[in-house]
């Protein structure tokens, strides 16, 4: 039977999805299932690993059934996943010893402080590209080994396995035959040396984590094993893995130095490819692993905006200025500018490049002439300003010239925001026809690994651009707007 499709498993923080792509990179079928969020204590976030697996395996079957696709028509399955989330299970039984500790969970803060006290903060930064923070997997592993009865003893006997969500799904799909991750996920564990591309023995010793627990690290564009869907049909290659943000970077074909993407969600995630240079940031950005055009390891700078779409939710839910997020474009376009109004949405402090947890949100420039439209416009513009803050930091750190900005996520449907992003960054913003770029990246990696597609050059013909947003303001206006934004940010920090 002819191989016509590639399936991407997109395992996210709140739902599991399966998306089927045809040879032209068109979406043929989508299936999605939400799963339970567990909050056993303040600041703790968990998932049930078995529910993750049940939801992901069911949507895989459902996505093919909906489109009437036989499993023998599937060339490969790729995996993309929420990063950092930590699962430990028994090697013999496949039974998790504890719930998955989610990337958002802060329970291992004390362990991070202990590592800082041991003088490891700079070592971590230099060798992993990360900050010493509970966000990442390493301290979550230690917490499980320290707090689950018999876990550490079992781990030292080689009876337990660790994996991020990609590894867990691969283990389940291959019925326990394959214990593997890829460099993009390994690089988010706090245990992976991004220069040697191997597990870091110094950090394993510091956290007392047995190396035997850890998965083998294989390239992101590889065939790892095979699976049969619902136990039927032929064996399908499991062929591409990347963490969600790196998958989106590859889905946008940002495979050369200076190429960048911004995912506009609740927050914004920006990644810039820096090629074969692991750039250490002087602006608090993370250095991480990306995927190059041949599936090889590239590096990237990564930064996040805390309040993106969440700022628009605040306008709707707390201020009642809009009924729906899509209303913002209409109201923002009713005025020529913000009339001097700036919103700095530092509701939970400011992230990179400021890193000021004590900053708080504020509206500046209010006069009797300021109205709802000005405030809504200022809220949208704040997303673009914060993204520019990060992009400028990436350019300074890397020395790369930003070629263009690829965009994805829910907010890219807002033409006003995309145009202002182009205006304020003085770079062309490119919105793709297929905005499911995270899943598309996993599909591209899987398809390339099995020869379904031959090269990134071929993929460039598949990845169509829906709209180009070109800068449309002069340099003096751009500078004046941004200087005023920086002044507003400084005021939130005083």
Swiss-Prot record:
It catalyses: glycerol + ATP = sn-glycerol 3-phosphate + ADP + H(+). GO terms for molecular function: ATP binding; glycerol kinase activity. ADP binds at residues 13, 17, 266, 309, 410, 414. GO terms for cellular component: cytosol. Its EC number is 2.7.1.30. GO terms for biological process: glycerol catabolic process; glycerol metabolic process; glycerol-3-phosphate metabolic process. Keywords: ATP-binding, Glycerol metabolism, Kinase, Nucleotide-binding, Transferase. Belongs to the FGGY kinase family. This is Glycerol kinase. It comes from the Bacteria. Glycerol binds at residues 83-84, 135, 244-245. It comes from Shewanella sp. (strain MR-7). Inhibited by fructose 1,6-bisphosphate (FBP). Pathway: Polyol metabolism; glycerol degradation via glycerol kinase pathway; sn-glycerol 3-phosphate from glycerol: step 1/1.
């Amino acid at each position: 039977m002819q191989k016509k499709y590639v399936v991407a498993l997109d395992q996210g923080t709140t739902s599991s999805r399966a998306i089927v792509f045809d040879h032209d990179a068109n979406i043929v079928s989508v299936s999605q299932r939400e799963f339970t969020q567990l909050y056993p204590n303040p600041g703790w976030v968990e998932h049930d690993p078995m529910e993750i697996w049940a939801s992901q395996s069911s949507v895989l079957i459902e996505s093919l059934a909906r489109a009437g696709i036989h499993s023998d028509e599937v060339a490969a399955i790729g995996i993309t996943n929420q990063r950092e989330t930590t699962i430990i299970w028994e090697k013999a039984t496949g039974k998790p010893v504890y719930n998955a500790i989610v990337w958002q969970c802060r329970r291992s803060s004390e362990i991070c402080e202990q590592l800082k006290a041991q003088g490891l903060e700079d070592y971590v930064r230099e060798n992993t590209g990360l900050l010493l923070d509970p966000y990442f997997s390493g301290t979550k592993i230690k917490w499980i080994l320290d707090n689950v009865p018999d876990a550490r003893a079992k781990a030292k006997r080689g009876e337990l396995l660790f994996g991020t969500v990609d590894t867990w799904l691969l283990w389940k799909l291959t019925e326990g035959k394959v214990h593997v991750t890829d460099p993009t996920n390994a690089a988010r564990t706090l245990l992976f040396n991004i220069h040697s591309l191997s597990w870091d023995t110094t950090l394993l010793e510091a956290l007392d984590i047995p190396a035997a627990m850890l998965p083998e690290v294989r390239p992101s564009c590889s065939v790892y094993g095979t699976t049969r869907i619902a136990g039927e049909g032929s064996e399908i290659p499991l062929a591409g893995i990347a963490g969600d943000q790196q998958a989106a970077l590859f889905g946008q074909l940002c495979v050369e130095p200076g190429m960048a993407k911004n995912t506009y969600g609740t927050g914004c995630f920006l990644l810039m490819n820096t090629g074969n240079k692991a750039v250490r940031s002087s602006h608090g950005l993370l250095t991480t692993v990306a995927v190059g055009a041949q599936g090889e390891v590239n590096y990237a700078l990564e930064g996040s905006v805390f309040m993106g779409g969440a700022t628009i939710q605040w306008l709707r839910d707390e201020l009642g200025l809009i009924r729906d997020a899509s209303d913002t474009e209409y109201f923002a376009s009713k005025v020529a500018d913000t009339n001097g109004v700036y919103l700095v949405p530092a509701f939970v402090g400011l992230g990179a490049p400021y890193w000021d947890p004590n900053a708080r949100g504020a509206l500046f420039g209010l006069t009797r002439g300021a109205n709802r439209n000005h405030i809504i416009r200022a809220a949208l513009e704040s997303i673009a300003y914060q993204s520019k803050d990060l992009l400028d930091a990436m350019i300074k750190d890397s020395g790369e010239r930003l070629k263009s900005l690829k965009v994805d996520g829910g907010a890219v449907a807002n033409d006003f925001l995309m145009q202002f992003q182009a205006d304020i960054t003085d770079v062309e913003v490119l919105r793709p026809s297929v905005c499911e770029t995270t899943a598309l990246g996993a599909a591209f990696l899987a398809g390339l690994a099995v020869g379904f597609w031959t090269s990134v050059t071929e993929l460039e013909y598949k990845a169509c651009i829906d709209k180009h947003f070109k800068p449309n303001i002069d340099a003096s206006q751009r500078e004046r707007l941004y200087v005023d934004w920086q002044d507003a940010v400084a005021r939130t920090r005083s």
